[in-house]
Amino acid sequence: MPGSLPLNAEACWPKDVGIVALEIYFPSQYVDQAELEKYDGVAAGKYTIGLGQAKMGFCTDREDINSLCMTVVQNLMERNNLSYDCIGRLEVGTETIIDKSKSVKTNLMQLFEESGNTDIEGIDTTNACYGGTAAVFNAVNWIESSSWDGRYALVVAGDIAVYATGNARPTGGVGAVALLIGPNAPLIFERGLRGTHMQHAYDFYKPDMLSEYPIVDGKLSIQCYLSALDRCYSVYCKKIRAQWQKEGNDKDFTLNDFGFMIFHSPYCKLVQKSLARMLLNDFLNDQNRDKNSIYSGLEAFGDVKLEDTYFDRDVEKAFMKASSELFSQKTKASLLVSNQNGNMYTSSVYGSLASVLAQYSPQQLAGKRIGVFSYGSGLAATLYSLKVTQDATPGSALDKITASLCDLKSRLDSRTGVAPDVFAENMKLREDTHHLVNYIPQGSIDSLFEGTWYLVRVDEKHRRTYARRPTPNDDTLDEGVGLVHSNIATEHIPSPAKKVPRLPATAAEPEAAVISNGEH
């Protein structure tokens, strides 16, 4: 039959394609949400309890989407002792657009110039917070295709989430995640198990090319998110049940079949409501619900229709209570980065994954299924799953990826808190200057984490020059390398063999390496 899969196709696929390594980056400063409540003159608990947020990371004008992605990529390469020529595909998922033509990926190619590796597929992928997941799927599809040349794929998801003054501002944040994709991975993409929903909606969008701020319909955005979750979960359940039936297992899939369930997290409270939403789906689909103790006390909701429940407080309250233990077991740990740093848009759901890996041992993770719900306004959404390898022995791939993230909490704790008025001043500075030419950023370089790339200047042709805050190991820098616009061939890129310390520098810093996006 035309278009059908050959019977022996699976034998040709690389084994256990998945996430081999993961690196996360967030800036060195945050604002406390409780202090922000006082500054904004809102009721105590509106941000901390109502949204579930404790702190919100932000960056000064010294960092932009290019520098965020450069930082997380170089950190991943260095910490995993990877050669730049082992990457065959590099794709960026972002909705932080600073150029309508030139991709972030092309800026990242500056990091590869010393290696001579230019044979790297992939560009940028954009649809609100979904771009990172689309890039991940493209990477997996490349490795499982005839185009694969045996090298790794590298996916970068990063964003700067900023909002105008008002109710949405405390749901901001900033960060980037880099994912190394390849075969024989500790976190394996379960083949054939993706439930996707695509729909036209104006829930959140950015039509103003001169502003970083979105237009948000808050109520519609929540409805779209939960509706997409309903549909994606339904499709996923049908697909995994079909797989199970082929294996002789005739049972329905439920939340209990996920070891962990992580979500795109605009704010933590929505994630808690989303897990409750999945339990509501299980409840309505269970023909024997009266025999399941988890549904005790929910009998009155047996005839509700999903589409009528998005803003039903009684349903929400009842199922949040019923799912509280499941939330603690399967989802709460995933909210570490979201609670402490805020919404990272495309990288948000992968920050949730990093949070889980950072807080559980390889033995606790081994063999578990991790459900992943990715959502981007407009809208695009997918629920898929990762299967954790069974091999949790010392030195295993699973041991290495968890070890690389074991300091995540200490890194979050090492950041510097700033007063809300300083945060507001930085937001106003971004608003006034993000589009300027002939601009030299005003933000402090000293406050950045070691190993952080930062913006040096924007010239009269909108060309951006970057430098990297050195680490104590950067002893190979040429004397006199200044902060000037220059060709990459004359500049130093720290060796991939060097390690990046996680905590901020305390000693006086040496001169910084400089990199630019070229004289074109």
UniProtKB/Swiss-Prot annotation:
It is found in: Cytoplasm. Its EC number is 2.3.3.10. Homodimer. Gene3D superfamilies: 3.40.47.10. It comes from the Eukaryota. Catalyzes the condensation of acetyl-CoA with acetoacetyl-CoA to form HMG-CoA, which is converted by HMG-CoA reductase (HMGCR) into mevalonate, a precursor for cholesterol synthesis. The gene is HMGCS1. Signal peptide: none annotated. Belongs to the thiolase-like superfamily. HMG-CoA synthase family. The modification Phosphothreonine is found at T476. The keyword Heme does not apply. It is an enzyme of class 2 (transferase). One of its GO terms (molecular function) is hydroxymethylglutaryl-CoA synthase activity. It catalyses: acetoacetyl-CoA + acetyl-CoA + H2O = (3S)-3-hydroxy-3-methylglutaryl-CoA + CoA + H(+). Transmembrane segments: none annotated. The modification Phosphoserine is found at S4, S495, S516. The keyword Cytoplasm applies. Pathway: Metabolic intermediate biosynthesis; (R)-mevalonate biosynthesis; (R)-mevalonate from acetyl-CoA: step 2/3. This is Hydroxymethylglutaryl-CoA synthase, cytoplasmic. The active site is at E95, C129, H264.
